[in-house]
């Protein structure tokens, strides 16, 4: 899980999800998991 000020899709399979006001990226590739914070 990467925590970044700005999250971007890293590949076609990345999805942007908002959970409790937090923007997250979920993907098949575990390296692409990100959270904004």
UniProtKB/Swiss-Prot annotation:
Species assigned in the record: Campylobacter lari (strain RM2100 / D67 / ATCC BAA-1060)
Top-rank taxon, per record: Bacteria
Stated family: Belongs to the bacterial ribosomal protein bL36 family.
InterPro entries: Ribosomal_bL36, Ribosomal_bL36_sp
GO function term, MF aspect, one: structural constituent of ribosome
NCBIfam families: rpmJ_bact (TIGR01022)
Keyword Nucleus: no
GO cellular component terms given for this protein: cytoplasm; ribonucleoprotein complex; ribosome
Keywords on record: Ribonucleoprotein, Ribosomal protein
PANTHER family to which the protein is assigned, alphabetical: 50S RIBOSOMAL PROTEIN L36, CHLOROPLASTIC, LARGE RIBOSOMAL SUBUNIT PROTEIN BL36C
Keyword set includes Ribosomal protein: yes
Pfam family, one: Ribosomal_L36
A GO BP annotation: translation
Protein name: Large ribosomal subunit protein bL36
PROSITE patterns: RIBOSOMAL_L36
